[in-house]
From Swiss-Prot:
Motif PP-loop motif per UniProt: ranges: 58-63
Name the UniProt record assigns to this protein: tRNA-cytidine(32) 2-sulfurtransferase
Organism of origin: Polaromonas naphthalenivorans (strain CJ2)
CC cofactor: Mg(2+); [4Fe-4S] cluster
One GO CC term on file: cytoplasm
UniProt-listed PANTHER family: AMINOTRAN_5 DOMAIN-CONTAINING PROTEIN (PTHR43686:SF1), SULFURTRANSFERASE-RELATED (PTHR43686)
Cell location: Cytoplasm
The keyword Glycoprotein is assigned to this record: no
Residues reported in the UniProt entry to bind [4Fe-4S] cluster: C133, C136, C224
Length: 314
């Protein structure tokens, strides 16, 4: 009897300790997410005093997490800014229209649902079997720009993360022959909106875990999510394989996006190769043309490069 009682006590104690460990890990994850989003906001001056930020919420894990983190930072930020969540209901068959309004109402955040049947347009114009993403994205972009103006928003926040940015860089290199990525902040192509990506420093792995912790009511994208062999998926798999084989490579590649040397590429629009002249003065930072390149064995890249104070201590 005593042995059974002791076993039960030990089992209960183990469960309590495991629960406490999970809580600690979840708290660390929350702090890391807030810190990394805060750093991006500060690094690129994404949100300023008096801004009204339109937070685009699709129903996926990334946009849910972005809204959640921005709400947390809003409470502790040294500046005042507004948030309004916006969802574009594209009238996809089976789309659960009630999910987002119920979630956002419960959250207590101002929100707007824009109803536009882009689904019919995309499926009518794009041949069966072809990727729908490009046209869908263009239609969605135009609508969201208009809505931002109607709501008086000064910034549009998108939920792209670090992995998205790296994938875009390689997609442009492989399929468009461009060294072009996904900027953390830009002026929209209509010249009227500033678009920000507050989760530029956040990993998809952390977002996946946070979605589980918060139990977000995820809405799958049935319009394009079922299409296999998309180029982005292929590039994503390639990057994940690299990271498994060479841990730290993803961090180094991401840091490289912030450490560009135009004079060592081949774009004459970015560097005046034709006008190069000798100066007769030694430059310790100059190029050693005949020396082999020296590379770090392991660079702590990623977070060391972006170590700037977030909006508030966390």
């Amino acid at each position: 009897m005593n042995a059974i009682w002791i076993d039960e006590q030990l089992e209960t104690s183990a469960r309590v300790q495991n629960s406490m460990k999970i809580e600690r890990e979840d708290h660390k994850l929350e702090k890391r997410l807030c810190r990394e989003v805060g750093r991006a906001i500060v690094d690129f001056n994404m949100i300023e005093e008096g801004d009204k930020v339109m937070v685009c919420v699709s129903g996926g894990k990334d946009s849910y997490a972005m809204l959640d983190i921005l709400l947390k930072l809003q409470k502790r930020a040294p500046i005042n800014f507004e948030l309004v969540a916006v969802n574009l209901d594209q009238k996809q068959p089976g789309f659960p229209e009630h999910v987002l309004p119920e979630y956002l109402s419960k959250l207590g955040v101002p929100y707007h649902i824009e109803n536009q049947d882009t689904y019919s347009i995309v499926t009518r114009v794009i041949p069966e079997g072809k990727t729908l993403c490009s046209l869908c994205s263009r239609l969605r972009r135009g609508i969201l720009y208009r809505v931002a103006g109607e709501l008086g928003c000064t910034k549009i926040a998108l939920g792209h993360h670090r992995d998205d940015m790296l994938q875009t860089f390689f997609l442009n290199m492989f399929f468009a022959a461009k060294l072009k990525g996904m900027p953390p902040k830009l002026v929209s192509d209509d010249g009227k909106n500033i678009v920000i990506r507050p989760m530029a420093y956040v990993t998809e792995k952390d977002l996946t875990r946070w979605a589980q912790v918060q139990d977000f009511p995820i809405i799958p994208c049935t319009l394009c999510g079922s299409q296999e062999n998309l180029q982005r998926k292929q590039v994503g798999n390639m990057l994940r394989d690299w990271q498994k084989q060479y841990p730290g490579r993803i961090e180094n590649m991401f840091s490289a996006l912030q450490n560009i040397v135009p004079s060592h590429l081949m774009d004459s629009k970015r560097h005046d190769f034709k006008g190069i002249r000798t100066t007769g003065v030694a430059d310790p930072e100059g190029d050693k043309a005949f020396d082999a390149e020296e590379f770090m064995q392991a660079a702590p890249a990623g977070r060391a490069v972006i170590g700037i104070n977030p909006l508030a201590p966390g």
